[in-house]
Structures are given as structure tokens and as C-alpha cells.
């Protein structure tokens, strides 16, 4: 049985877009599920869109997310070079061969002539003008050094038919296709040509890419057939949408992998969520490690319908991953965000991390969740009103001085001791402990929702700061 070989072939034009990451992930999962190889190829034929440093970002994004490729520019392999700009001679060799086979031809048309083909609706389709040049005329113009491109010779009529492993039988009228350029005037190949040559020479068995290539695939098949090569199997993936009407777009700066990492999403969670954008595992399992995905991956679970990117679901999933981290691992992940916050250098960061663990969905929200630690913010006294705990401003005004007195008597300001001591004091007083802790929380944080309860926060703040904040809140209540 033929060994499965898939590839991810991104253009180095910026950050790793989530759509590209999903293509890489599915290509990786399909190859590894079937005991095959996953190859990285850099498609840098469009030099005008090349972004410095983008290739290194591709390497780091793939390796950082666990998608380890078996062959590629930086790891080598038997089918290199794996960068298209280093394969120009190969493309020219096959372009000339395709011309000999009648599948392509030289085109010398000027920019002005091409523009004259534009109709009243702004559409332009090449009219095969140079297809009819004699061999002698072509050789004369080449010898004279005239600029040229090489175009594919698409049949003027008939229907192309091929099978896609997701969408089934695809039919495209040749009349709807244009004699697209294969080799540009600067000598560089276009994607339409290079991907066919490379996929064949690199032994790619399954081509996995987005549905935007469904209508272009007949052009590629014409070249496979002209060369007498076996066509690869095609797996086209559904579009990822930003919302009901707009696609996620790399060109417009939408969701990229590095942005989410910087926001504080764990790479494992991002990969897990991206896997679900178009694929539903059996039993509707949502949380999976990469090895589990490899084991479960099946084309049967891939949808034909577009999927909508939902950052709230990513946040939920990321929160699940954060809660599974050990205390030390969470601290290591949280530390860069704690160091950027106002608490740095003033409080015990390990205690803050312990307070936050399991109470954040992504690490980037840490600074805003702890800004109250530095100083008590001004707050609305209506926060003391709580039916469940039977408190209001008047109850707080009466009870807070007693809470302060109780705290003054306590030397051990650890969470456990504070909780036990205050619960006993509340019982002796004949009030609900919930009332005591609610009033205390508002008084020392100015917030109804905090990462941690009143006694956890008091331990973090320490006795002196806790009592100072209670004094400040008493001042608010007695104005």
C-alpha cells in the first residue's frame, strides 16, 4: 500500500493565520493517522508579498503547536529544495516540456493589449492570441529578447470532472477557465504551476487545502494528465467564517496564531479549538490532546459547510486547559503577565497566581483582574446590597466595625485561620458568615466578583493593608 504523504505549503506573507494553521493541522493529522509523512514547503514565488521573518514564524508556529514536519527547508529531506524560489530551474524544465506537449505556450502580449481585452463589466479573459504563433515566430521573438510569460493551454470547451474526498464529484466547464500564467515575466513560476510540479516530484499522495481551490483543480489535472502523472487525491476543506457573512482573512489582519498566544491562550488549546473548525470527532468529544486527535482523525467527520470562528468557545476551552495546569505550571505561564501588572514588586506573585488559578480563561485578562490589589478603587456602596446574604449599606455600616475588631485580634492571617476565626465570630454574634464575608470582600476590594474569597484576599493583602482598606470603606459608609 502506498505511503501517505501530505504537505503544508504556506506563503511567507505574515503571521500564521488560523485558516492556514487548520490546513496544516488536518494535513498533519491525516498523515500521522495513516502512518505517513507530513512535509513543509515554502511557496515564496510571489516575491512582492514576501515578509521578512515570516518563514521563521512559520517554523516556530508549527513546532510550537506540536505539528512536527518530517521534511522541510530547515530539517532537510530527500525531495528538496523545499523552498520554491530555489527550484526555478526545475519549473523552467517542466514548463518547456509542457509546451512541447501542447499544454502551454509562450505569450508576448503587451500590457496595453491585455488591458484592451477588458469588457464593459471590467472582466478580462485572455483570448489565446499567442497560441497561434508559429514555432519560428516564437523562436525569433525569444532570440530578440522580447519579454514573455508562459500560459497554460486550457480547452475552449468540454467539462472537467474529478473526485474530492469531501465534496464528491466536482464538475467545471472549461469555458469558465482562463489560460492562466504558469511562468511570469520575471521568470518565477505562479502557484498554479509550481504546486503541481512540486506535489508530483515530492510524492504527495493527498492534497489538503481550502475550498477556494475547488474550481482551480481542473487546471492542475490538465497538467497531471499532460505529463502522464497520476493525480493526487484531493481533500478540500470548508471555509472558516468570521461571522455569518464574512470569511476569516489573513489579508485583513483577522485571527492569527501568534496574536492568540500573546493574548494568553495556551498553544494546546488553540490547536484543539482549530481542530473543531470543520471536524467533529466521534462521540462529539471536544477536548483532545494532539496524540488523541491523531488517533481519532477521520475524513468522515469533516463538514462540507463553513464553520464560524467563535472566540468565546476558544476562551472556554482555554479555561479548561488552564484549570488542568499544576500550580507551578500555571505560575510559570502567568508570570509574564503578572510582571507587566501594577502588582509587580509589591506583592507575593506566587500567592496572586494561586488566587487566579482556575479563575481566568486566558492569561491576558490577569492584569485587569488584579488591578484592585494595588489600591482600593472607588466603588458604588450599592455593592453592599445583597439579598442572598441579607446585607445592605446599613447592615454593612453596623457590622464592618465589628469585623475590623475581630481582625485586629487575629495574628495568623492565613486564609484557613481567617476563615475559621471569622466563621466562629459570626456564629457567636448570631449573623450569617455569608454576610460577614460579603461585607468584608466589598470593603477590601470594592468589587462583588473577585478571584478568591474575602479571607484569601486578606491573606494576600496582609493584616495592615486589610485593616487600612476597612477604615477607608468605613469612611465611605459614614459620609
Predicted segments with their positions:
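N-terminal Rossmann-like or analogous alpha/beta NTP/dinucleotide-binding catalytic cores
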Residues: 1-122, 217-229
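Charged substrate- and nucleic-acid-binding regions of tRNA-handling and nucleotidyl-transfer enzymes
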Residues: 416-477
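Conserved phosphate-binding loops in nucleotide/dinucleotide-binding enzymes
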Residues: 81-85, 183-184, 202-214, 241-273, ...
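Glycine-rich phosphate/pyrophosphate-binding loops
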Residues: 32-44, 193-206, 227-241, 452-455, ...
Amino acid at each position: 500500500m502506498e505511503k501517505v504523504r501530505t504537505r503544508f505549503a504556506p506563503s511567507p506573507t505574515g503571521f500564521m493565520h488560523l485558516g492556514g494553521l487548520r490546513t496544516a493541522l488536518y494535513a498533519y493529522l491525516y498523515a500521522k493517522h495513516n502512518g505517513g509523512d507530513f512535509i513543509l514547503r515554502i511557496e515564496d514565488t510571489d516575491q512582492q508579498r514576501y515578509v521578512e521573518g515570516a518563514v521563521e514564524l512559520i517554523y516556530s508556529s508549527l513546532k510550537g503547536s506540536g505539528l512536527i514536519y518530517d521534511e522541510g527547508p530547515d530539517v532537510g529531506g530527500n525531495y528538496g529544495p523545499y523552498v520554491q524560489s530555489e527550484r526555478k530551474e526545475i519549473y523552467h524544465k517542466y514548463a518547456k516540456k509542457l509546451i512541447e506537449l501542447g499544454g502551454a505556450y509562450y505569450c508576448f502580449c503587451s500590457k496595453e493589449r491585455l488591458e484592451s481585452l477588458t469588457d464593459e463589466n471590467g472582466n478580462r479573459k485572455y483570448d489565446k492570441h499567442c497560441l497561434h504563433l508559429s514555432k519560428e515566430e516564437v523562436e525569433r521573438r525569444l532570440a530578440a529578447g522580447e519579454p514573455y510569460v508562459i500560459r497554460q493551454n486550457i480547452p475552449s470547451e468540454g467539462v472537467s470532472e474529478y473526485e474530492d474526498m469531501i465534496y464528491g464529484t466536482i464538475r467545471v466547464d472549461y469555458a469558465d477557465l482562463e489560460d492562466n500564467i504558469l511562468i511570469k515575466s520575471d521568470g518565477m513560476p505562479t502557484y498554479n504551476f509550481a504546486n503541481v510540479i512540486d506535489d508530483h516530484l515530492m510524492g504527495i499522495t493527498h492534497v489538503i487545502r481550502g475550498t477556494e481551490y475547488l474550481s482551480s483543480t481542473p487546471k492542475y489535472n490538465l497538467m497531471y494528465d499532460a505529463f502522464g502523472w497520476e493525480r493526487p487525491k484531493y481533500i478540500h476543506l470548508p471555509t472558516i467564517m468570521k461571522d455569518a457573512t464574512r470569511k476569516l482573512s489573513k489579508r485583513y489582519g483577522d485571527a492569527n496564531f501568534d496574536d492568540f498566544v500573546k493574548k494568553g491562550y495556551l498553544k494546546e488549546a488553540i490547536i484543539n479549538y482549530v481542530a473543531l473548525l470543520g471536524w467533529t470527532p466521534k462521540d462529539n468529544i471536544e477536548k483532545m490532546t494532539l496524540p488523541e486527535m491523531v488517533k481519532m482523525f477521520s475524513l468522515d467527520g469533516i463538514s462540507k459547510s463553513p464553520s464560524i470562528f467563535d472566540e468565546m468557545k476558544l476562551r472556554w476551552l482555554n479555561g479548561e486547559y488552564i484549570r488542568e495546569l499544576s500550580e507551578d505550571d500555571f505560575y510559570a505561564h502567568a508570570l509574564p503577565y503578572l510582571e507587566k501588572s501594577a502588582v509587580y514588586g509589591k506583592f507575593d506573585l506566587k500567592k496572586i497566581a494561586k488566587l487566579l488559578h482556575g479563575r481566568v480563561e486566558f492569561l491576558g485578562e490577569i492584569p485587569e483582574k488584579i488591578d484592585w490589589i494595588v489600591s482600593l478603587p472607588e466603588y458604588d456602596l450599592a455593592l453592599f446590597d445583597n439579598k442572598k446574604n441579607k446585607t445592605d449599606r446599613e447592615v454593612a455600616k453596623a457590622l464592618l466595625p465589628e469585623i475590623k475588631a475581630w481582625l485586629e485580634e487575629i495574628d495568623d492571617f492565613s486564609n484557613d485561620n481567617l476563615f475559621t476565626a471569622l466563621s466562629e465570630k459570626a456564629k457567636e454574634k448570631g449573623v450569617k458568615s455569608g454576610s460577614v464575608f460579603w461585607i468584608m470582600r466589598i470593603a477590601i476590594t470594592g468589587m462583588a466578583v473577585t478571584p478568591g474569597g474575602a479571607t484569601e484576599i486578606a491573606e494576600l493583602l496582609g493584616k495592615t493593608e486589610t485593616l487600612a482598606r476597612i477604615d477607608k470603606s468605613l469612611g465611605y459608609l459614614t459620609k
